[in-house]
Curated annotation (Swiss-Prot):
Chemical reaction(s) catalysed: ATP + H2O = ADP + phosphate + H(+)
Origin superkingdom: Bacteria
Protein's UniProt name: Holliday junction branch migration complex subunit RuvB
Binding annotation for DNA: 313, 318
Residues spanning the membrane: none
Keyword ATP-binding appears in the UniProt entry: yes
Keywords, alphabetical: ATP-binding, Cytoplasm, DNA damage, DNA recombination, DNA repair, DNA-binding, Hydrolase, Nucleotide-binding
Domain comment, as recorded: Has 3 domains, the large (RuvB-L) and small ATPase (RuvB-S) domains and the C-terminal head (RuvB-H) domain. The head domain binds DNA, while the ATPase domains jointly bind ATP, ADP or are empty depending on the state of the subunit in the translocation cycle. During a single DNA translocation step the structure of each domain remains the same, but their relative positions change.
Length: 342
Protein backbone atom coordinates (compact mmCIF):
# COMPACT_ATOMS: atom_id res chain seq x y z
CA UNK A 1 0.00 0.00 0.00
CA UNK A 2 1.37 3.43 -0.88
CA UNK A 3 0.17 6.81 0.34
CA UNK A 4 2.39 8.77 -2.02
CA UNK A 5 -0.68 10.16 -3.77
CA UNK A 6 -3.13 9.96 -0.88
CA UNK A 7 -5.54 12.90 -1.12
CA UNK A 8 -5.25 13.47 2.64
CA UNK A 9 -1.45 13.40 2.92
CA UNK A 10 -0.63 16.91 4.27
CA UNK A 11 2.72 17.14 2.46
CA UNK A 12 2.78 18.77 -0.96
CA UNK A 13 3.78 16.87 -4.07
CA UNK A 14 5.92 18.91 -6.54
CA UNK A 15 3.20 19.08 -9.26
CA UNK A 16 0.81 20.61 -6.71
CA UNK A 17 2.96 23.61 -5.87
CA UNK A 18 1.97 25.67 -8.93
CA UNK A 19 -1.70 24.92 -8.26
CA UNK A 20 -1.28 25.88 -4.60
CA UNK A 21 0.34 29.19 -5.58
CA UNK A 22 -2.71 30.12 -7.66
CA UNK A 23 -4.98 29.58 -4.65
CA UNK A 24 -2.90 31.47 -2.09
CA UNK A 25 -4.38 34.69 -0.66
CA UNK A 26 -2.23 37.75 -1.23
CA UNK A 27 -3.11 39.74 1.90
CA UNK A 28 -3.74 39.10 5.59
CA UNK A 29 -7.34 40.24 5.17
CA UNK A 30 -7.88 37.31 2.77
CA UNK A 31 -6.15 34.73 4.97
CA UNK A 32 -8.84 32.37 6.23
CA UNK A 33 -8.56 31.00 9.75
CA UNK A 34 -5.76 31.45 12.29
CA UNK A 35 -7.40 34.74 13.27
CA UNK A 36 -5.30 35.21 16.39
CA UNK A 37 -2.05 34.77 14.46
CA UNK A 38 -3.27 37.02 11.63
CA UNK A 39 -4.23 39.79 14.08
CA UNK A 40 -0.91 39.62 15.91
CA UNK A 41 1.13 39.52 12.72
CA UNK A 42 -0.91 42.35 11.23
CA UNK A 43 -0.03 44.53 14.22
CA UNK A 44 3.68 43.74 13.85
CA UNK A 45 3.65 44.62 10.14
CA UNK A 46 1.58 47.79 10.60
CA UNK A 47 3.94 49.03 13.32
CA UNK A 48 6.97 48.34 11.13
CA UNK A 49 5.44 50.22 8.22
CA UNK A 50 4.60 53.22 10.40
CA UNK A 51 8.20 53.35 11.69
CA UNK A 52 9.73 52.70 8.29
CA UNK A 53 11.70 49.71 9.58
CA UNK A 54 11.93 46.06 8.64
CA UNK A 55 9.70 43.77 10.73
CA UNK A 56 11.16 41.53 13.41
CA UNK A 57 12.23 38.06 12.36
CA UNK A 58 9.25 35.66 12.32
CA UNK A 59 9.12 31.97 13.28
CA UNK A 60 6.09 29.96 12.13
CA UNK A 61 5.64 26.43 13.43
CA UNK A 62 2.98 23.79 13.00
CA UNK A 63 2.04 20.70 10.99
CA UNK A 64 2.36 20.66 7.19
CA UNK A 65 -0.26 22.35 5.05
CA UNK A 66 -1.51 24.99 7.51
CA UNK A 67 -0.25 28.09 5.67
CA UNK A 68 3.32 28.81 6.77
CA UNK A 69 4.57 29.44 3.23
CA UNK A 70 1.46 31.48 2.45
CA UNK A 71 2.04 33.70 5.49
CA UNK A 72 5.67 34.27 4.48
CA UNK A 73 4.52 35.45 1.06
CA UNK A 74 1.83 37.63 2.62
CA UNK A 75 4.45 39.28 4.86
CA UNK A 76 6.48 40.19 1.76
CA UNK A 77 3.36 41.42 -0.03
CA UNK A 78 2.16 43.53 2.91
CA UNK A 79 5.62 45.12 3.21
CA UNK A 80 5.92 45.59 -0.59
CA UNK A 81 9.21 43.71 -0.37
CA UNK A 82 10.80 41.00 -2.52
CA UNK A 83 11.03 37.50 -1.10
CA UNK A 84 13.86 34.97 -1.31
CA UNK A 85 12.92 31.34 -0.69
CA UNK A 86 15.17 28.52 0.44
CA UNK A 87 15.05 25.54 2.80
CA UNK A 88 17.12 24.08 5.59
CA UNK A 89 18.17 20.94 3.69
CA UNK A 90 19.46 23.13 0.83
CA UNK A 91 21.81 25.03 3.16
CA UNK A 92 24.38 22.53 4.35
CA UNK A 93 27.44 24.81 4.32
CA UNK A 94 27.99 28.23 5.84
CA UNK A 95 29.13 29.44 2.43
CA UNK A 96 25.71 28.61 0.96
CA UNK A 97 24.04 30.84 3.52
CA UNK A 98 26.63 33.61 3.16
CA UNK A 99 26.00 33.73 -0.59
CA UNK A 100 22.26 34.19 -0.05
CA UNK A 101 22.53 36.74 2.76
CA UNK A 102 25.13 38.88 0.99
CA UNK A 103 22.88 39.17 -2.07
CA UNK A 104 19.75 40.31 -0.22
CA UNK A 105 18.44 43.80 -0.92
CA UNK A 106 17.36 46.13 1.93
CA UNK A 107 14.03 45.07 3.43
CA UNK A 108 13.92 41.73 1.62
CA UNK A 109 12.05 38.82 3.21
CA UNK A 110 14.12 35.64 3.44
CA UNK A 111 11.86 32.61 3.83
CA UNK A 112 13.67 29.57 5.18
CA UNK A 113 11.46 26.49 5.16
CA UNK A 114 12.32 23.48 7.34
CA UNK A 115 14.72 25.69 9.25
CA UNK A 116 15.29 22.91 11.80
CA UNK A 117 17.15 20.91 9.13
CA UNK A 118 19.86 23.50 8.52
CA UNK A 119 23.46 22.48 9.21
CA UNK A 120 25.16 23.57 12.43
CA UNK A 121 27.79 25.83 10.74
CA UNK A 122 25.10 27.62 8.75
CA UNK A 123 22.95 27.93 11.86
CA UNK A 124 25.77 29.62 13.77
CA UNK A 125 26.33 32.06 10.91
CA UNK A 126 22.62 32.88 10.95
CA UNK A 127 22.79 33.95 14.62
CA UNK A 128 25.08 36.87 13.78
CA UNK A 129 23.17 37.78 10.63
CA UNK A 130 19.85 37.97 12.48
CA UNK A 131 21.21 40.02 15.35
CA UNK A 132 23.86 42.30 13.84
CA UNK A 133 23.14 42.07 10.09
CA UNK A 134 26.64 40.82 9.50
CA UNK A 135 28.31 37.59 8.48
CA UNK A 136 31.90 36.57 9.12
CA UNK A 137 33.47 34.78 6.19
CA UNK A 138 36.55 32.75 7.09
CA UNK A 139 39.40 33.02 4.61
CA UNK A 140 42.27 30.54 4.75
CA UNK A 141 42.82 27.48 6.90
CA UNK A 142 44.50 26.58 10.15
CA UNK A 143 46.25 29.16 12.36
CA UNK A 144 46.41 31.65 9.50
CA UNK A 145 42.65 31.70 8.91
CA UNK A 146 41.06 35.14 9.09
CA UNK A 147 37.42 36.09 9.60
CA UNK A 148 36.35 38.90 7.31
CA UNK A 149 33.13 40.66 8.40
CA UNK A 150 30.64 41.42 5.64
CA UNK A 151 27.79 43.82 6.34
CA UNK A 152 24.40 42.76 5.01
CA UNK A 153 21.32 44.97 4.59
CA UNK A 154 18.46 44.80 7.11
CA UNK A 155 16.18 41.90 6.22
CA UNK A 156 13.36 39.88 7.76
CA UNK A 157 13.90 36.17 8.23
CA UNK A 158 10.73 34.09 8.19
CA UNK A 159 11.54 30.60 9.45
CA UNK A 160 9.09 27.73 9.11
CA UNK A 161 9.26 24.42 10.93
CA UNK A 162 7.10 21.40 11.60
CA UNK A 163 9.32 20.48 14.56
CA UNK A 164 9.94 23.56 16.69
CA UNK A 165 11.40 21.43 19.47
CA UNK A 166 14.43 20.66 17.31
CA UNK A 167 15.41 24.33 17.09
CA UNK A 168 18.18 25.30 19.52
CA UNK A 169 17.28 27.92 22.12
CA UNK A 170 19.71 30.58 20.82
CA UNK A 171 18.06 30.44 17.40
CA UNK A 172 14.50 30.56 18.75
CA UNK A 173 15.40 33.51 20.97
CA UNK A 174 16.43 35.61 17.98
CA UNK A 175 12.93 35.63 16.50
CA UNK A 176 10.95 38.68 17.54
CA UNK A 177 7.60 37.11 16.68
CA UNK A 178 6.73 33.43 16.94
CA UNK A 179 3.43 31.78 16.05
CA UNK A 180 2.14 28.23 16.38
CA UNK A 181 -0.38 27.43 13.65
CA UNK A 182 -3.25 25.18 14.73
CA UNK A 183 -5.55 22.92 12.76
CA UNK A 184 -8.50 24.78 11.24
CA UNK A 185 -12.14 24.62 12.24
CA UNK A 186 -14.55 23.23 9.65
CA UNK A 187 -16.21 26.65 9.29
CA UNK A 188 -12.86 28.25 8.38
CA UNK A 189 -12.14 25.49 5.88
CA UNK A 190 -15.58 26.00 4.33
CA UNK A 191 -14.68 29.64 3.63
CA UNK A 192 -11.34 28.56 2.16
CA UNK A 193 -13.01 25.97 -0.08
CA UNK A 194 -15.61 28.52 -1.22
CA UNK A 195 -12.91 31.07 -2.07
CA UNK A 196 -10.76 28.50 -3.87
CA UNK A 197 -13.76 27.24 -5.84
CA UNK A 198 -14.28 30.77 -7.13
CA UNK A 199 -10.62 31.03 -8.13
CA UNK A 200 -10.59 27.77 -10.12
CA UNK A 201 -14.09 28.21 -11.53
CA UNK A 202 -16.04 25.51 -9.71
CA UNK A 203 -19.65 26.28 -8.82
CA UNK A 204 -20.66 24.68 -5.52
CA UNK A 205 -24.24 24.19 -4.38
CA UNK A 206 -25.13 24.95 -0.77
CA UNK A 207 -23.57 22.38 1.53
CA UNK A 208 -20.94 21.10 -0.92
CA UNK A 209 -18.18 23.21 0.63
CA UNK A 210 -19.07 21.77 4.03
CA UNK A 211 -18.85 18.21 2.68
CA UNK A 212 -15.33 18.88 1.41
CA UNK A 213 -14.22 20.84 4.48
CA UNK A 214 -15.40 18.22 6.96
CA UNK A 215 -13.17 15.58 5.33
CA UNK A 216 -10.08 17.80 5.14
CA UNK A 217 -8.45 16.91 8.47
CA UNK A 218 -8.33 20.55 9.56
CA UNK A 219 -5.78 21.34 6.83
CA UNK A 220 -6.24 23.91 4.01
CA UNK A 221 -3.81 22.11 1.70
CA UNK A 222 -5.93 18.96 1.94
CA UNK A 223 -9.15 20.97 1.50
CA UNK A 224 -7.86 22.49 -1.75
CA UNK A 225 -6.64 19.09 -2.96
CA UNK A 226 -10.02 17.48 -2.28
CA UNK A 227 -11.71 20.40 -4.04
CA UNK A 228 -9.62 19.70 -7.15
CA UNK A 229 -10.59 16.03 -7.06
CA UNK A 230 -14.26 17.01 -6.74
CA UNK A 231 -13.77 19.36 -9.70
CA UNK A 232 -12.37 16.46 -11.75
CA UNK A 233 -15.39 14.32 -10.88
CA UNK A 234 -17.82 17.14 -11.69
CA UNK A 235 -16.17 17.83 -15.06
CA UNK A 236 -16.40 14.16 -16.08
CA UNK A 237 -19.98 13.77 -14.83
CA UNK A 238 -21.11 17.20 -16.08
CA UNK A 239 -22.41 18.32 -12.69
CA UNK A 240 -22.66 22.05 -12.08
CA UNK A 241 -23.21 23.29 -9.50
CA UNK A 242 -21.64 20.49 -7.50
CA UNK A 243 -24.12 19.19 -4.92
CA UNK A 244 -23.18 17.83 -1.49
CA UNK A 245 -24.13 14.37 -2.78
CA UNK A 246 -21.86 14.83 -5.79
CA UNK A 247 -18.95 15.91 -3.58
CA UNK A 248 -19.59 12.94 -1.31
CA UNK A 249 -19.60 10.53 -4.26
CA UNK A 250 -16.33 11.97 -5.56
CA UNK A 251 -14.59 11.72 -2.19
CA UNK A 252 -15.92 8.22 -1.60
CA UNK A 253 -14.29 7.29 -4.91
CA UNK A 254 -10.95 8.47 -3.48
CA UNK A 255 -11.64 6.49 -0.29
CA UNK A 256 -11.83 9.52 2.00
CA UNK A 257 -14.54 8.89 4.58
CA UNK A 258 -16.71 11.51 6.36
CA UNK A 259 -14.11 11.92 9.13
CA UNK A 260 -11.24 12.36 6.66
CA UNK A 261 -9.77 8.88 7.14
CA UNK A 262 -8.19 7.33 4.07
CA UNK A 263 -7.29 3.76 3.17
CA UNK A 264 -4.09 3.72 5.25
CA UNK A 265 -5.83 5.12 8.33
CA UNK A 266 -8.50 2.44 8.15
CA UNK A 267 -5.90 -0.27 7.51
CA UNK A 268 -4.06 0.79 10.67
CA UNK A 269 -7.28 0.66 12.70
CA UNK A 270 -8.22 -2.75 11.27
CA UNK A 271 -4.76 -4.10 12.02
CA UNK A 272 -4.66 -2.88 15.62
CA UNK A 273 -8.23 -3.91 16.41
CA UNK A 274 -8.64 -7.14 14.44
CA UNK A 275 -5.26 -8.58 13.46
CA UNK A 276 -3.72 -7.88 16.85
CA UNK A 277 -6.84 -8.12 19.01
CA UNK A 278 -6.64 -4.60 20.36
CA UNK A 279 -2.89 -4.51 20.89
CA UNK A 280 -0.66 -3.20 22.15
CA UNK A 281 1.32 -3.53 18.91
CA UNK A 282 4.72 -2.08 18.06
CA UNK A 283 5.27 0.38 15.22
CA UNK A 284 7.45 -1.93 13.11
CA UNK A 285 4.99 -4.82 13.38
CA UNK A 286 2.09 -2.52 12.58
CA UNK A 287 3.89 -1.10 9.53
CA UNK A 288 4.63 -4.57 8.17
CA UNK A 289 1.00 -5.62 8.62
CA UNK A 290 -0.29 -2.69 6.52
CA UNK A 291 2.52 -2.88 3.95
CA UNK A 292 4.02 0.52 4.69
CA UNK A 293 7.25 2.00 5.99
CA UNK A 294 7.24 2.68 9.76
CA UNK A 295 7.97 6.37 9.10
CA UNK A 296 4.89 6.66 6.88
CA UNK A 297 2.65 5.10 9.52
CA UNK A 298 4.16 7.25 12.27
CA UNK A 299 4.11 10.57 10.39
CA UNK A 300 1.09 10.30 8.08
CA UNK A 301 -1.52 8.05 9.71
CA UNK A 302 -0.91 8.08 13.45
CA UNK A 303 -1.05 11.84 14.19
CA UNK A 304 -4.56 12.13 12.78
CA UNK A 305 -5.77 8.94 14.46
CA UNK A 306 -4.40 10.17 17.79
CA UNK A 307 -6.00 13.59 17.26
CA UNK A 308 -9.37 11.94 16.58
CA UNK A 309 -9.04 9.92 19.77
CA UNK A 310 -8.90 6.61 17.89
CA UNK A 311 -5.38 5.53 18.82
CA UNK A 312 -3.14 5.74 21.88
CA UNK A 313 0.64 5.54 21.83
CA UNK A 314 1.80 3.75 24.95
CA UNK A 315 5.25 2.55 26.08
CA UNK A 316 4.20 -0.99 25.11
CA UNK A 317 2.81 -0.07 21.67
CA UNK A 318 -0.27 1.22 19.87
CA UNK A 319 -3.69 0.62 21.44
CA UNK A 320 -7.11 1.45 19.92
CA UNK A 321 -9.68 3.40 21.92
CA UNK A 322 -13.34 2.51 22.25
CA UNK A 323 -14.10 5.12 19.57
CA UNK A 324 -11.87 3.25 17.12
CA UNK A 325 -13.74 -0.03 17.67
CA UNK A 326 -17.10 1.68 17.20
CA UNK A 327 -15.94 3.51 14.06
CA UNK A 328 -15.28 0.07 12.57
CA UNK A 329 -18.79 -1.01 13.57
CA UNK A 330 -17.52 -3.23 16.38
CA UNK A 331 -18.11 -3.33 20.09
CA UNK A 332 -14.93 -2.82 22.12
CA UNK A 333 -13.92 -5.88 24.14
CA UNK A 334 -14.64 -5.77 27.89
CA UNK A 335 -10.93 -5.49 28.70
CA UNK A 336 -10.33 -2.71 26.14
CA UNK A 337 -7.43 -0.48 27.25
CA UNK A 338 -9.18 2.55 25.81
CA UNK A 339 -12.43 2.04 27.70
CA UNK A 340 -13.91 5.28 28.92
CA UNK A 341 -10.95 7.44 27.94
CA UNK A 342 -12.70 9.23 25.09
Amino acid sequence: MSVEHSPVDPSAEPPEKAEEAALRPGALAEFGGQQRVADQLGLVLAASKSRGTTPDHVLLSGPPGLGKTTLAMIIASEMSAPIRISSGPAIQHAGDLAAILSSLVPGEVFFLDEIHRMSKPAEEMLYLAMEDFRVDVVVGKGPGATAIPIEIPPFTLVGATTRAGLLPGPLRDRFGFTAQLDYYEVADLERIVTRSAGVIGVELAEGAAHTIASRSRGTPRIANRLLRRVRDWADVHHESPVTPQGAETALDLYEVDPLGLDRLDRAVLHAVCLKFGGGPVGLSTLAISVGEEPQTVEEVAEPFLVRLGFLMRTPRGRVPTDRAWRHLGLEPPPDSSGEGLF
